[in-house]
A protein has these predicted regions:
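A glycine- and charged-residue-rich anion-binding loop/surface
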Residues: 3-397
Length: 397
């Protein structure tokens, strides 16, 4: 649980930083005056609305002009506010004489959705009618990622057991990450099995549904609740067919086939007892595989006669051969350097014998140090200064 609590605390701290510049009482004053504040983003990506409040520099204001950074509250909004690991919608709010470009949406206090952005042109005023529209392509990419996270979560729990419960996530356009408790690195065979299982279910094109119900009903249905998340009496259950059921307030695709492809990229540690899987979904996953295919083709062309499945062994053999050649070359250079050094006559300076020499060949620092130590041991009361050049750099020992 320690790792899970750390992830939750990090998410809370990040959200607190995004609202630190505004006194919460300013938000509450807008919320108290608003007649209704409604999120319609599950069903719509654009809608008519009206501005219920504007904040600039952390203070409520009646209007804002081009160039102003503002926070706006609307009566009705299709914009999804960041939460549950899902990044916020981007888009625009257009008024009669002005337009705001929205690049962040937050809920600084429960029930209040705040849209943040810059007034790109004209002027906006409190109370005026506006048209709000989200970036549909971004939303679709994020929704794919969120549904993919649910499916990857379920697959890990099936394979590793119930301890592999989500301890954090981020759903971005075309990519996602998934954190979960684990005592050590997850074997590659498990990652391959998760990927195979999830993509197999994409082919089945399972229906993805979202249903509101009570917590009791959700538990009877077997829906998964995440540690550290807060739920009301009524909850929203997102189901991928009959396979994965999870309490979630995020946006999702309509069918699993819309994900196209899920590709797990990496698995790593992000803290004591917590592992992170990063992945791509949809077009981003296909682009990644296309790049990998081009790289593979290039390697097979470089290594004549090699089949793709033979590349790891062939490259490993080549690396070992190169290392052996480097060792032999180092031995040869050391022997050649020693012979060249034998021709150098020490210069007596008082009781000290000075041996200073610049080699005619390129020698690295290790070889120079070895030669210097051997020479110093051979000649008593000696000071040895050796130099060479290597890749246009002066090397001293």
């Amino acid at each position: 649980l320690v790792g899970s609590e750390m992830c939750i605390r990090d998410r809370s701290d990040a959200k607190a930083k995004r609202t630190a510049h505004t006194d919460l009482s300013e938000y509450r004053s807008i919320q108290d005056k608003a007649k209704r504040l409604e999120f319609i983003g599950y069903a719509k990506t654009k809608s008519d609305s009206s501005i219920m409040g504007i904040l600039k520099d952390g203070k409520v204001t009646k209007s804002a002009q081009a160039g102003d950074e503002v926070e706006v509250v609307m009566s009705v909004t299709p914009f999804y506010a960041e939460g549950g690991g899902q990044l916020p919608d981007h888009g625009s709010i257009k008024a009669t004489n002005g337009e705001i470009e929205i690049d962040d949406v937050q809920t600084p206090i429960p029930g209040l959705i705040v849209h943040r952005g810059i007034v790109r042109q004209g002027e906006i005023s409190q109370g005026e009618s506006v048209f709000a529209e989200i970036d549909g392509e971004r939303r679709t990419g994020i929704s794919r990622a969120h549904t993919a996270t649910h499916m990857v979560h379920k697959a890990f729990r099936e394979i590793l057991g119930e301890t592999a419960t989500q301890a954090g996530s981020e759903n971005a356009p075309g990519r996602f990450r998934f954190d979960f408790p684990a005592t050590g690195a997850v074997p590659k065979s498990v990652l391959q099995e998760v990927e195979f299982r999830v993509n197999g279910l994409l082919e089945q094109d399972l229906e993805v549904t979202a249903t509101e119900m009570t917590q009791v009903e959700a538990r009877k249905l077997g829906a998964m609740a995440l540690f550290g998340e807060k739920y009301g009496e009524r909850v929203r259950v997102v189901s991928v067919g009959e396979w994965a059921k999870e309490l979630c307030g995020g946006t999702h695709v309509k069918r699993s086939g819309q994900l196209g492809l899920v590709k797990l990229l990496s698995e790593s540690s992000i803290g004591a007892g917590v592992r992170r899987v990063e992945a791509l979904v949809g077009v981003d996953a296909f682009k990644f595989l296309a790049r990998e295919h081009l790289i593979l083709n290039s390697l097979t062309e470089l290594i004549k006669g090699a089949q793709p499945e033979e590349l790891p062994e062939r490259i490993s053999t080549m690396i070992q051969t190169i290392k052996e050649i480097e060792r032999e070359l180092k031995t040869f250079r050391q022997a050649s350097g020693a012979k060249e050094l034998e021709l150098v006559k020490p210069k007596g300076i008082g009781k000290v014998q000075l041996i200073a020499h610049k080699f005619s060949m390129d020698l690295d620092g290790d070889v120079l140090r070895t030669l210097a130590l051997k020479t110093r041991d051979k000649i008593s009361n000696s000071v040895v200064v050796l130099s060479s050049t290597l890749e246009n750099r002066v090397v001293l020992a």
